[in-house]
């Protein structure tokens, strides 16, 4: 019997997968532990997603690591998360490099602790020439603020005469987003059973397929990732067209 991975069509893979990694707290609570216990065990799920992407050659993976709203969580949890991010970057840096992955960071990283900022920039720098895949971490990220910042930048350029109002297009707007160097998202996955977007990549998921999984993030494995890709491949992406129009293009 074929595995899910073997059933995948290598000619119909998403170029960009984004994941809202949700459910760490509930996973820990179900085991009688503190929320931070779930965050620590979630690292293996991150490895699983990265390795799965690497195995089937999906070029872009974006992980919603820490949202701008997460700063409102209890201070001890935020501190633990920052320490965990720092430790994980140190532990995983060599593996990320050896896989040929290029690291990207999106979000308001100036709010992160100086040590974490430094580690992130070092990882971005040492992987900048890697070309076997792209790992994008969304840190201190909020899509509404990203869009608002883009509007402000464009407004300032119009006011200063650098840009004419009639020249503002979707492409121009996208060049002012954190994700200006990334392709649109093809598949958005959220774990934990919650059905919402949570201020994540609102512009970039305009035509993405959305999948909401009941599994909690620490339990997420490579087979779960491959199942998401399999389900994606069995959906018809129309981009506003009819099925008949798509058939005519084949």
Regions found by a protein language model. Give the residues of each.
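Flexible, compositionally biased loop and terminal segments
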Residues: 1-250
